[in-house]
Amino acid sequence: MQAIKMYRMALDQIPSTQREVQFRIQRNIGNAFVRLGQFQNAIQSYERVQEVQADVQAAFNLVLCFFAMGDCERMRSSFKKLVAIPIEDPVGDSAHVVSGVDADSSDDDDDGDDDDDHDLRRRRYFESGTLETELESRRMRATEYITTAARLIAPVIEKESWIEGYEWIVKTLEKSQHSKIGSEMTIAKSLQYLKEKRFKEAIDVLKGFEKKEKDLMARAANNLSFLYFLEGDVEQADKYANVAVRTDR
């Protein structure tokens, strides 16, 4: 409780212009309440951050709190809010700006030198190690938070059946900008079938990846090879092992 008191004193000293610092302190207050097992107080701290700014870390922490409390309905609502937070695409942003500059320069050949200088400044702004790298780092952190939250709550959000929980997670992700994580969760669903020795269902799920992206297809083929090997079907096991090798070279 002493740490929380000190955090609140610090929060009172931070000017309103330094919102990022305020958010970090508010998140730390929530983290301290989590350590004390006071999840409702932690939720209030994280929600204060969310009210002002969509924050991936605070949204993820809310999912964890509702998971700890066993509140399935609020797990679903908080997960929806987490995946709805917009994540900037560094590749898309840089490509858009650079292509936009090229388009402008082609309109007026008389200003070619000025356009070249402007193009150079833009390229330096987006070169590796600057904004582009920071955006990529944020995207990777957001992906990790969302994937972890999805794996955590998928088996428990539907009390009647873990299968329905995975299906809800996959559908929610496919409707968002994180459809690839939805594919990851489909593979996780097949592994859950495997844990329960329901090989046929696991195989059916994995076969749906035969026309997907190469990295997902390779992983699915690798798992299919293993499943067929467990069932004693050496021919099919060899077939999918070769598919995995060819796809992931």
Locate each region found by the language model.
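Non-TPR docking regions that flank or precede TPR/alpha-solenoid scaffolds in eukaryotic proteins
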Residues: 1-249
